Amino acid sequence: LPGIAEVMEYLHEIGVKMAVASNGKEEHIRTGLKRKGFEKYIGAIATKEEVENPKPASDVYLLAANKLGVNIENSIAIEDSKPGAIGASKSGATLILQTNDITKHMDFTGVQYAYKDVDLLETIKDVVENK
C-alpha cells in the first residue's frame, strides 16, 4: 500500500501496537515483512491457518487483536481487498479502505468503512487522536 511505511513508522513512534491479519501463510508474511524492513513494527501475525473461517469472515482480525491484547473496537484495519474489507468491517475495527488498481472498480456496497481512498498518514493521525 502506498504510504504504509510512513504509517508504520508513525504508529511505532507513538507506541501503537500493530499486527498483520492475513489470508496468507505466516511463512510468506514473515518473509515479506523482513524483505521490506517492517518486522520490527509488527507485534503479532494472525493468519487463515489459525482460524476456522478466513476472510471475508472477521476471525483473523479478532485473533490479531487478541494476540496484541487490544479491544477490536479500539483497532484500525487498513485494507485494499474486498474480502479483507468485509472481514474488517464485520470485526468492529475502524476500517480504512484503500483501493488499488484492481479493486478500485469493485462494488463495496454494504462494507462499513470509515474512510476510503484517503491520505493514509493524515487519516491515521486523525483516527488515532480521536480513539
Predicted segments with their positions:
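Hydrophobic beta-strand core positions in alpha/beta domains
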Residues: A19-V20, L97
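Short, flexible segments with low predicted structural confidence
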Residues: I4, K17-M18, K36, V60
